[in-house]
């Protein structure tokens, strides 16, 4: 069994009507924001890579836009993106204009209705896989634009073809090496630049080293042109599949040693 869960948090553009009617932007302005903030076709990359892989991973996908809620934020004051109005429930747009006029109580309702059940479901899947095979590797799949957005905290950082987001506790040197090897032919690779860290469910964060995680932030112009797959799409999916196969092989080797 594959130890891998591909997490696809930002691929959807779906915004429920009851959420959309409280946003301060609509029409072309909202579509522009979705174009900027959606990790377009990362869901298709995950699906294509899964089909290519020898051992199929689990895919956990957010079916709602990150403008509804962002599953990868900390739901408290420790979230650094709160400073730009982009915690779990965004109050500002990517160019730092108002997105919502929302109270703390209203924000908490969204957290309770969307964020908490989502987090609990992913946490349950990780727990289930740990009980089944004793290890989990989360591939946190994202894409990002070639030009920095106003909300970004590290606008001056390099913007490589691939940013590997790592965590000191949950990302081993071996996992980084496997990712580097899988993507070695697709351009330059940096660590934690321009985005830092990787997703781990809060119940395991900083506590269980059996949960490994690495973020793949793929620069959009390497596989998309105006939101449409380019000639780089299939090689990118193939690289993800190569990483899946390498992780499954390592898992099999570890299992045979136990």
Predicted regions and their residues:
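N-terminal catalytic or cofactor-binding beta/alpha core of small enzyme domains
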Residues: 1-138, 143-257
